[in-house]
From Swiss-Prot:
The keyword Signal applies. Residues 549-601, 669-721, 1338-1392, 1515-1568 form the TB domain. Residues 1335-1402 are annotated as: 8-Cys3 region. It comes from the Eukaryota. This is Latent-transforming growth factor beta-binding protein 1. Glycans are attached at residues 339, 370, 416, 612, 639, 761, 793, 929, 1011, 1042, 1051, 1133, 1216, 1242, 1357, 1479, 1678. Residues 181-213, 391-423, 618-658, 865-906, 907-948, 949-989, 990-1029, 1030-1070, 1071-1111, 1112-1152, 1153-1193, 1194-1235, 1236-1277, 1278-1320, 1415-1457, 1458-1498, 1612-1652, 1653-1697 form the EGF-like domain. Residues 1498-1712 are annotated as: C-terminal domain. One of its GO terms (cellular component) is collagen-containing extracellular matrix. The 8-Cys3 region in the third TB domain mediates the interchain disulfide bond interaction with the Latency-associated peptide chain (LAP) regulatory chain of TGFB1. Disulfide bonds join 185-195, 189-201, 203-212, 395-405, 399-411, 413-422, 551-573, 560-586, 574-589, 622-633, 628-642, 644-657, 671-694, 681-706, 695-709, 696-721, 869-881, 876-890, 892-905, 911-923, 918-932, 934-947, 953-964, 959-973, 976-988, 994-1005, 1000-1014, 1017-1028, 1034-1045, 1040-1054, 1056-1069, 1075-1086, 1081-1095, 1097-1110, 1116-1127, 1122-1136, 1138-1151, 1157-1169, 1164-1178, 1180-1192, 1198-1210, 1204-1219, 1221-1234, 1240-1252, 1246-1261, 1263-1276, 1282-1294, 1289-1303, 1305-1319, 1340-1363, 1350-1375, 1364-1380, 1365-1392, 1419-1432, 1427-1441, 1443-1456, 1462-1473, 1468-1482, 1484-1497, 1517-1541, 1527-1553, 1542-1556, 1543-1568, 1616-1627, 1622-1636, 1638-1651, 1657-1672, 1667-1681, 1683-1696.
Amino acid sequence: MAGAWLRWGLLLWAGLLAWSAHGRVRRITYVVRPGPGLPAGALPLAGPPRTFNVALDARYSRSSTAASSRALAGPPAERTRRTSQPGGAALPGLRSPLPPEPARPGGPSRQLHSKAGAQTAVTRFAKHGRQVVRSQVQQDAQSAGGSRLQVQQKQQLQGINVCGGQCCHGWSKPPGSQRCTKPSCVPPCQNGGMCLRPQLCVCKPGSKGKACEITAAQDTMPPAFGGQNPGSSWAPLEQAAKHTSTKKADTLPRVSPVAQMTLTLKPKPSMGLSQQIHPQVAPLSSQNVMIRHGQTQEYLLKPKYFPAPKVVSAEQSTEGSFSLRYGQEQGTAPFQVSNHTGRIKVVFTPSICKVTCTKGNCQNSCQKGNTTTLISENGHAADTLTATNFRVVICHLPCMNGGQCSSRDKCQCPPNFTGKLCQIPVLGASMPKLYQHAQQQGKALGSHVIHSTHTLPLTMTSQQGVKVKFPPNIVNIHVKHPPEASVQIHQVSRIDSPGGQKVKEAQPGQSQVSYQGLPVQKTQTVHSTYSHQQLIPHVYPVAAKTQLGRCFQETIGSQCGKALPGLSKQEDCCGTVGTSWGFNKCQKCPKKQSYHGYTQMMECLQGYKRVNNTFCQDINECQLQGVCPNGECLNTMGSYRCSCKMGFGPDPTFSSCVPDPPVISEEKGPCYRLVSPGRHCMHPLSVHLTKQICCCSVGKAWGPHCEKCPLPGTAAFKEICPGGMGYTVSGVHRRRPIHQHIGKEAVYVKPKNTQPVAKSTHPPPLPAKEEPVEALTSSWEHGPRGAEPEVVTAPPEKEIPSLDQEKTRLEPGQPQLSPGVSTIHLHPQFPVVVEKTSPPVPVEVAPEASTSSASQVIAPTQVTEINECTVNPDICGAGHCINLPVRYTCICYEGYKFSEQLRKCVDIDECAQVRHLCSQGRCENTEGSFLCVCPAGFMASEEGTNCIDVDECLRPDMCRDGRCINTAGAFRCEYCDSGYRMSRRGYCEDIDECLKPSTCPEEQCVNTPGSYQCVPCTEGFRGWNGQCLDVDECLQPKVCTNGSCTNLEGSYMCSCHRGYSPTPDHRHCQDIDECQQGNLCMNGQCRNTDGSFRCTCGQGYQLSAAKDQCEDIDECEHHHLCSHGQCRNTEGSFQCVCNQGYRASVLGDHCEDINECLEDSSVCQGGDCINTAGSYDCTCPDGFQLNDNKGCQDINECAQPGLCGSHGECLNTQGSFHCVCEQGFSISADGRTCEDIDECVNNTVCDSHGFCDNTAGSFRCLCYQGFQAPQDGQGCVDVNECELLSGVCGEAFCENVEGSFLCVCADENQEYSPMTGQCRSRVTEDSGVDRQPREEKKECYYNLNDASLCDNVLAPNVTKQECCCTSGAGWGDNCEIFPCPVQGTAEFTEMCPRGKGLVPAGESSYDTGGENYKDADECLLFGEEICKNGYCLNTQPGYECYCKQGTYYDPVKLQCFDMDECQDPNSCIDGQCVNTEGSYNCFCTHPMVLDASEKRCVQPTESNEQIEETDVYQDLCWEHLSEEYVCSRPLVGKQTTYTECCCLYGEAWGMQCALCPMKDSDDYAQLCNIPVTGRRRPYGRDALVDFSEQYGPETDPYFIQDRFLNSFEELQAEECGILNGCENGRCVRVQEGYTCDCFDGYHLDMAKMTCVDVNECSELNNRMSLCKNAKCINTEGSYKCLCLPGYIPSDKPNYCTPLNSALNLDKESDLE
């Protein structure tokens, strides 16, 4: 997209924003009017929409003029009632600051015209100015009736726009309202215009004028300014109502504060539009307006002035101007373009806060203004238009690095940046005066101005309020205001759709910019580029703001490189130096674009991050680790800069330090534009280039060996192309200054050919010559033009320290620096001041620079420097601080001078020092500069030092068709040409001669500029009084026969009837031969008739309803055709399609049945065939099935799963099957399964030494102790322990007996001791000798049959009786175990005379044989080892181990193990049982479900979903009720009655959340038919603890109220009225009706009112074990115990004893 000139401007038509004396704030509406557009022929600007930055600058200033001082003492003027007068009228409540305007020579007939050429605006200014004078006179006349007016105000209107109790002039009340809110415009607004405020019409696009009476066709647009006329300039509009009288200057009243708002709209160029657009700046009014604010402070409003520059081309540049061209060679003609952006509205509210102190008491008070609106009109605008005290500038420059667009084409840069766009960093350079102009304009006399930024979307709405879909625009609103003031931005919206003009005579990427600034010697044309990257908004990926990741500085393809050390946030990385970011994997940082949605907010610029919706904060890049390697990082606004170490230099962007580059080779070679995937170089250029020029431009490879060029963005690319793509740096530019070291100093030596110059007395040209941003390096420029001027940083009289020797000779005329200061000469216009740390060195003054012939030597001194510049950075004010060995000095900015007394930079008052400055105007001194305020009709000179008259007559559009006479500050039109006359607006307008009927009585009159022409009328018209009237031919007879006639303008047309067509001239109708058309009378004959045709159809066809076709007759509509088939219609006939089993007859008109049994002998083989209508049936015998309806085949029953079971094999036979069972199984009675043979039915199978245990398909013999089963498993045989256990009797003789063995001693006087395993002498009981030491303590072992028996230690340090008389199986130390004697043997009786569980004690209630015994507390003695995973309870004698539900106690391993419930077939009937720890799960196969017992899988029936007969209304049941009585957790899967819900499941019922009674209340017992039981005892390990104080008695119930026991007599089942008559219980009558009293083992189901079985194994087994050493199995109404393996039932109920113990007891009983 080619660049373009853009002319844009807004006129701010505004009153004054002021605070009244009573503290109220008036509402003021500002309308931004457009200026003229471009002439016809200019094309609209294409491309994406532009973004505007809107800046509101509010400034409060104090008056310092003599006139304001005299105004304080003057008498108060009368209050004016006219608030609608722009430019001069004061607000209600404010005194008029303007004196009346004296009469001008020439009388009132003289017309004043604006500078911009907008005729309507000039008249309005003049009229308003006169109204102000008349208003003042009226006020003086009404002052006598002030008292009478005050009485009327009490009874009349109040509020806004009320003057003296009535609506102010220009305001009225809407119907039905008592507020003055309706403005009036006289004359009324035309062409759809809107009366915005009194006498101000807002016109629609295409119209303008005071009353919008001028349309676009009547408006004469001025030609575009540009390079065609160097002497022309775009002047501003003239201020209306010049008040130049000095008669009342001494009587001006006291003034109030005024807010000066400066609105700046800044369109940003888009990426696709390479252009530089420059607005123009026009002067403001020259008058000062003073308004009262309270009674203490006074402010003076000073309108700003900005020079209106000329626009010239490069060829037409003269002295005093120069041009800057982008991408275009010198000599190319400029191009022109205009812009149409539509109307823009800005809504804001100003406010000001102050502190009022009275007698030491201070209070804060804030006054807030009404909502203020600024609107642009008509969509066309000049660059800068002004109104009283307001200025609107449209700025198109994208100022970077914190710069602000001040006016026209100037960026106000911060001190450390310069250049056209503030894109060039600079260290220590003085700021040019014109760059400081905008900043210093914001500083009033002694006032302090602060900035605030608001970012808002630029919304777009049509006039009907419907949103227009355009890409989003974001507006940055910069508000410049004093600290006590603030501005709140509400809305920035575009009212109309944007438009523009296309670019002409330009190439893509080219644009030309011309400037006019201070005088320079010649025109300089340079090439410059700037990056748009900082202007594109960024939309970051959605990520957590606190998430950290790695930051990558290079991204090539999908590879990320140059990762910074440490972690950082995504917004800090992508907003500054990073190109990718991530932790585990990297992702590219998205580009800053925001055109995805209309209302989407744009992100902050590069280098900033968003704090909130309206504020962007600078990112401190120096906090990121790894930034500026080989250097020190210095943070700047929106960026950062690297100060490099010795041996390194900054890259072109000053963002990194690179090693000193080598000298670039000047060797030339071929440059290739393409490299194929196979590394073949293609498309060489016709000339040989250096590698730098090739790779930095269009080349992809270079040299005879096809060396690939480095990729852009890599370090290798930056080394060879430091200026970036498209830029090369010559070898002389790559050389760095010479480094010389003096101690810790690093001083840069100036080259020899650099010529020193004195300090320039005039400011440098603006803008300065710019180099590309990428090409800025620390280098020196050498060339045939000589060295560039050097900017010195200190006065010439200072001394320079030595660079290469101990003494330095000062040459006359050389620039000199202060001691301790040196200069890094990066560029002639960008010096950098660095501080030195070494002490001063001796300096020798040359003879030429000294009056004495002797050299003066300054001895070195050792001092401690205090760097005042670091301690107080603002010590110099408007200047740069330079630290010296003694104190400091200041290098002041232009417009300032150094004050030795104040030690700072003070402003130079140019107005006082320069005489005759600002002639024809008024000079106003500003901070660092001055301002010429020119009156209306004058403009600033090119130098900005004088006011010169604007010759409006030089404009070709002024006084067109007449004579223009220029006057001082104005112009007038006289002597109109022939055919023209003077209009009321003062212009010559054409006379329309055609308005007279007699001008052309028989011809058409055509008006021309200045004349007219009579033209004869064409055919079909006749002339009459200058107009051509149509002739109605339809009135003539015989016109349009066979049709109707329609008269047209100048002709007629025939509309023909059906069957006729018009002739080519549409003046006649002719017959149509329809038969020539091929689509008529198909299947028939066509005959044409007059205006129609006729069809004759053949057999089988009939005429259609439209009579134009022969249609087929559908015979199939008759239902009797084709029975047993389908009738298919054909052309002229039909056919029958018969069903399967039928066939068509010979004639084809019906279907006949096919006898398959006779015609097909292959059907029903092995069976009987029976013919049916349309088919046949086959009947097969048993054991056979039909195969594809062709024959009978055998059924393979063995294919059915589960047939013959898992212990049989199915054998298929013809028509049947047979089961062959395995050994140990026999076929069942139905012959379908194999059943197990119970061999244990024969009692003799295992003889008398064991018992039989049947197994699947076999059996086994479980032998008693001392017996074992043989290899064949038949019976039990004795075990010979003497052979099996070698040495079991030691020295004694082992004798085997049946089931056991005996140890016999050889000496008859000895007996075998099983405790010691030796034979000992027989002793009597009264011998007094202890059989064994009783007090010896060792370890007690259990389960000696375990392989790891050494680890089975019950307890250490116990006696043998404590071990063997309780639960121990062995006793000893270090796994040397002595087995405990078996219970029931003589050894056991000898050791434990009182049996198991009793051990000897000192004192005991058991006293037998003189020894005391006590109960052994096994739980205390052995701890957790005796009852693992369970609860141990000591008993007398013995102990009990209580296991958790679902587990059982193993007395051998002394541990609670999980019970496998799945071994019980009743645990999960017809389902799959899965055992779990302490329980089990029963899974059913779909669609089967668990029944209520959760032990059986059943088929779901509809009865489960139906409401049973005994149920009442069902609803939701809520399982939980919160403390706030909120129902939650509804019961899923079923609805319940109120009783069922409250008694079984939940806490509330129904959609109304009806609460259930408390479970311990009487209502709950009554509802659920249960007695009150109190608190239940807990289950588990604490079940046997005494809780008598906390709980009721064990037996339930413990209390029943009498009202629940009225009558519990038993009734018969038929009398009960309950379903099933209370089975398993008895029916009793209660007060509420009937209920069931269930038998033991059953409980009442309240839902079904039936007695259901109590599962004691699950409900009671958790309190204590119901079955000891057995498994609990629930039965109907009770339960049973099934002994575990190794246990047999005992005589105790629900108790199983070990098998060994039972056998021993049986032997003892047999012996007895």
